[in-house]
């Protein structure tokens, strides 16, 4: 009878996909460097008792590490700030599909990977900010207009090696084609207020210091500046206003990108990982994101923070986000050809 019961339990375990090899932890390879992530993982640990371990590096390094580790990789999840990197990892065969009705119900359908290999947790817009003293909103219109010579010596932006700019250029390439984006990029270079340097915060600080009049930045950085404990950063944030480009009736909308997770092909803690992703896309966790990182929620039930709401709603470029990876190499070639350092 004892052996019979053991046999029955073994069959049930197979039928219901019991995984006796899963440990009480999750291992994440993360490109994200935000304090809110630590808070989210701590909240999850308290709720479930599942330990979250994080290794941080840039996205390409982490993807290469996953490739080299193969079936022996300890990683369960890969998280990055760029849909293009998620698409790259999927093309490399490093991920498996994420199957969860709860996640699919939580996340806006327009943001989720149509192939099922990655999910968004937040998104942001690549916006324009302009000097309150030297620029009027009526002077601004589109990304394309920034190449006009009227902006010569007035535009601030970070290096072409930055993933945010590469994603923007990829979206422009997909929407406009090679010839147009090469002309656009040349125009932007001619209009630089200075050689590209620093991060997005530094571009806003440069406007405040009178070194330029317009900057291309991620939307959440303005929220971070305005909520900073450093008065200099608050002052910089207050010196500019937010403008969402390409909002006209016949325009495509502003470029967005996501932060998102993929589950590794050989994830040793698959069920724990699904639990974490279900939590991170829940209303509770999404509210934590928007009120701490000033990103937009991937869950449409969650409103932006009060600061972000004050900028108003905007039309989103509905380009398939996987194309941010598809056109990445072409975007980099455009930067190189046009001298965008």
Protein language model regions, located:
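Short, low-complexity disordered leader/linker segments with a strong preference
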Residues: 1-26
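Early extracytoplasmic/lumenal segment of secretory-pathway proteins
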Residues: 18-88, 341
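A structural signal for short loop-to-beta-strand junctions that line the ligand-binding cleft
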Residues: 27, 73-78, 96-128, 144, ...
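Short beta-strand->loop
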Residues: 29-32, 114-115, 130-132, 138, ...
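A bilobed periplasmic-binding-protein/Venus flytrap-type ligand-binding module shared by bacterial periplasmic
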Residues: 129-134, 256-269, 288-291
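Periplasmic-binding protein-like
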Residues: 153-160, 279-303
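Ligand-binding pocket segment of bilobal, Venus flytrap-like solute-binding proteins
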Residues: 171, 176-245
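An extracytoplasmic/periplasmic, membrane-proximal ligand-sensing/linker region
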Residues: 179-181, 295-341
């Amino acid at each position: 009878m004892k052996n019979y019961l053991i046999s029955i339990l073994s069959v049930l375990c197979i039928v219901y996909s019991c995984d006796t090899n899963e440990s009480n932890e999750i291992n994440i390879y993360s490109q994200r460097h935000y304090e809110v992530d630590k808070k989210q993982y701590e909240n999850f640990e308290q709720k479930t008792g599942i330990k979250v371990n994080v290794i941080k590096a840039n996205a390409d390094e982490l993807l290469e590490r996953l490739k080299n580790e193969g079936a022996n990789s300890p990683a369960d999840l890969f998280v990055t700030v760029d849909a293009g990197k998620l698409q790259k990892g999927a093309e490399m065969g490093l991920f498996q599909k994420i199957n969860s009705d709860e996640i699919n119900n939580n996340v806006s359908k327009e943001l989720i990977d149509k192939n099922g290999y990655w999910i968004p947790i937040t998104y942001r817009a690549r916006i324009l900010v302009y000097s309150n003293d030297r620029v009027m909103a009526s002077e601004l219109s589109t990304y394309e207009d920034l190449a006009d010579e009227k902006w010569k010596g007035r535009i601030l932006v970070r290096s072409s090696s930055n993933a945010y700019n590469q994603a923007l250029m990829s979206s422009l390439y997909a929407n406009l084609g090679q010839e147009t984006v090469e002309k656009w990029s040349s125009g932007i270079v001619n209009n630089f207020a200075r050689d590209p340097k620093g991060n997005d915060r530094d571009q806003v600080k440069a406007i405040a210091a009178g070194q330029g009049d317009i900057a291309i930045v991620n939307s959440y950085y303005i929220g971070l500046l305005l909520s900073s404990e450093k008065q200099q950063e608050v002052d910089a944030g207050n010196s500019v206003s937010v403008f969402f480009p390409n909002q006209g009736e016949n325009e495509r909308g502003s470029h967005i990108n996501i932060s998102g997770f993929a589950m590794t092909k050989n994830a040793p803690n698959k069920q724990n990982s699904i639990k974490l992703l279900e939590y991170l896309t829940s209303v509770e966790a999404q509210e934590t994101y928007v009120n701490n990182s000033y990103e937009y929620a991937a869950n449409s039930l969650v409103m932006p923070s009060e600061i972000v709401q004050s900028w108003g709603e905007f039309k989103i470029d509905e380009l398939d986000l996987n194309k941010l990876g598809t056109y990445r190499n072409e975007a980099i070639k455009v930067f190189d050809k046009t001298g965008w350092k």
